[in-house]
Amino acid sequence: MRTLKNIIYLGMKELRSLMRDKAMLALIVFAFTVSIYSSATVTSGSLHLAPIAIADQDRSQLSERIINSFYEPYFLAPADIDISQMDGLMDSGTYTFTMDIPPNFQRDVLAGRRPAIQLNVDATRMSQAFLGNSYIQNIVTGEVNTFLAKTRQNTVLPVDLDIRARFNPNLNQMWFGSVMAIINNITMLSIVLTGAALIREREHGTIEHLLVMPVTPFEIMMSKVWSMGLVVLLASLGSLLLIVRFLLQVPIEGSITLFMCGVALSLFATTSIGIFMGTLARSMPQFGLLMIMVLLPLNMLSGGMTSRESMPQFVQDIMQTMPTTHFVSLAQAILYRGADFLIVWPQFIYLIIIGGVFFGAALLRFRKTISAMA
């Protein structure tokens, strides 16, 4: 009972210390509001409002059909330019695409001469250039074929292919980006808060005060784990409800309660990692460097940004020992596919085991550090 009281008391002390740290509070608010919204809305897997200009030297029915086939939301309304303006507009970056339809284009098409349309692409805009190039080729080819046939061509297939996209019918990138941003920020902040709390006490000299109190290293460490974990847990819940569900209108298919249980288990592991890193670093700059070395692989190789099946087998095996891999798996299953506990229980077991291992390793390292300071 005394141990529990000490853990609660020390945890409340950590929360009061965090409330006085304006920079850390600003980071928490930013990470679960602006960062989530921008990650969801800025990243897009499709072409969106790409600027295009067309120099129509033919002024024929076919060239008009091609020009009118570029419309929102994929392209802005095509600008009508002169051929002499094309190079200057590309150099200034005004348009991502400029197209030159040559004279007598329609006549040559009808005569079967295979005339060429020049398409200039500003490759410095990588996303638009890569996607727009294929979009424009398909649009121009489709309009030319339609014009030649005088009617829309419907290819009759020997079988009916009925394609249905499950869990994200419109293939909306925002649904994926918002949830993955929350997952990544949960990992990042849980490590930062616990590690920074330990380093802050060392820099301010308050860790020496704890050494003369009747508390154990386990109680000190556990207080930091539950207090900083609680902050991240509540912040992630608020972000999921207010930013993702309410503001972005992203549907949550599964149980939020079950997801938050998974968050709590993941926080148990990641906060322990933060404590371990805090014992290794001697200052906040060193801790920041360690963060880069640890956080990037955890986020990049957990299966959220890149499919795990696309990674080398030895990388997959290594990442199975990391909590983020199983957290991403259960989060996607619950929030996207509406999975219940009977489906995600293996991930829960993995998180408990991995969290226990990291907590034990961090506790041993923390005790060694405390003994060296005593």
Residue positions per predicted region:
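Transmembrane helix boundary and interhelical loop/hinge segments in multi-pass membrane proteins
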Residues: 191-213, 225, 370
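Alpha-helical transmembrane segments and their short interhelical loops
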Residues: 33-37, 217-291, 296, 342-348, ...
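Transmembrane helix segments
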Residues: 37-47, 281-321
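Junction motif at the cytosolic side of a transmembrane helix
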Residues: 2, 197, 276, 335, ...
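Membrane-interfacial helix-loop-helix junctions in multi-pass membrane proteins
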Residues: 167-171, 303-358
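Long, hydrophobic alpha-helical segments
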Residues: 174, 178-195
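Extracytoplasmic/periplasmic domains immediately adjacent to an N-terminal transmembrane anchor
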Residues: 1-175, 343, 368
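Short, membrane-interfacial amphipathic segments enriched in basic
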Residues: 1-11, 76, 314-325, 374
